[in-house]
Amino acid sequence: MGLMWGLFSVIIASAAQLSLGFAASHLPPMTHLWDFIAALLAFGLDARILLLGLQGYLLSVFCWYKTLHKLALSKAYALLSMSYVLVWIASMVLPGWEGTFSLKALLGVACIMSGLMLIFLPTTKQRY
């Protein structure tokens, strides 16, 4: 059950990160404070996506709380690295994100996935 909560947390946090990235690229920069506030108060699509991303992070924290009650800390924190993989893949697949493929990034993803497999491999009981 802890693994399920952990995966929910990672998926929701990844979606929230993508939402916040979209909002940040479409809203005025915060250095233009009055334009930024006006865009938020207009509550257009960009502001709604920003709010959705923030709510996603809040929901992700709840799932993470449940994860930490059910799953060993060493395994739970390893799951967080999945977010890097999901966001990288989504940035290449989703239109408008302009994520780029590189062998260096693919090698990084392979390292992350290999590490996760090592951490989550079932342990064999040693006989003494």
UniProtKB/Swiss-Prot annotation:
Stored Gene3D superfamilies: 1.10.3730.20
Domain of life of the native organism: Bacteria
Species, as recorded: Escherichia coli O7:K1 (strain IAI39 / ExPEC)
Compartmental location: Cell inner membrane
Classification via InterPro entries: Flippase_ArnF, Small_drug/metabolite_transptr
Protein name as it appears in the record: Probable 4-amino-4-deoxy-L-arabinose-phosphoundecaprenol flippase subunit ArnF
Topology relative to the membrane: Multi-pass membrane protein
Gene Ontology molecular function: carbohydrate derivative transmembrane transporter activity
Quaternary structure annotation from Swiss-Prot or TrEMBL: Heterodimer of ArnE and ArnF.
Residue spans crossing the bilayer: 3-23, 33-53, 77-97, 101-121
NCBIfam families: PRK02971.1-2
Main location: membrane
GO BP terms: lipid A biosynthetic process; lipopolysaccharide biosynthetic process
Key word Cell membrane present: yes
Function (record text): Translocates 4-amino-4-deoxy-L-arabinose-phosphoundecaprenol (alpha-L-Ara4N-phosphoundecaprenol) from the cytoplasmic to the periplasmic side of the inner membrane.
Database matches in SUPFAM superfamilies: Multidrug resistance efflux transporter EmrE
UniProt keyword annotation of Ligase present: no
Periplasmic side: 24-32, 98-100
Cytoplasmic side: 1-2, 54-76, 122-128
Swiss-Prot/TrEMBL keywords: Cell inner membrane, Cell membrane, Lipid A biosynthesis, Lipid biosynthesis, Lipid metabolism, Lipopolysaccharide biosynthesis, Membrane, Transmembrane, Transmembrane helix, Transport
One Gene Ontology cellular component annotation held by this UniProt entry: plasma membrane
